[in-house]
Amino acid sequence: MSRPARQLARVIGPAAVPGVAALFKILGDPSRLALLDLISHGERAVADLAAEAGLTESATSHQLRILRTARLVRVRRAGRQVFYALDDLHVARLLRDAAAHAGEK
């Protein structure tokens, strides 16, 4: 194991490293981050998310499915519309912390 990987294991525990790495891989996609940012302001319909993110509804649904599988967003259906919201406050904190870290010089 490389030195940075050993240091990470000390913070989150060796058993959690693969899951955390998978989460960061999911968050590494700009389209998914843009969708999470839009959803962080409140529950949103797929069509609205697609329009604001500049994606097709099909591409948006695909990315949202990945985020839902990772338990980052939750879904609510109302008739023919599908709405997404952040799964919990941990997701909002994760996004806020990542943005703060990325903005550090």
Model-derived segments and spans:
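Beta-hairpin "wing" of winged helix-turn-helix
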Residues: 68-78, 85
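Conserved segment of winged-helix/HTH DNA-binding domains
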Residues: 16-20, 24, 85-105
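Helix-turn-helix DNA-binding motif, specifically the short coil turn and the N-cap/start of the second
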Residues: 45, 56-59, 87
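Short capping segments at the starts of secondary-structure elements
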Residues: 30, 41-45
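Alpha-helical residues within the helix-turn-helix
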Residues: 51, 62, 68-69
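N-terminal leader segment of winged-helix/HTH proteins
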Residues: 1-27
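Residues within the alpha-helical elements of helix-turn-helix
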Residues: 38, 52
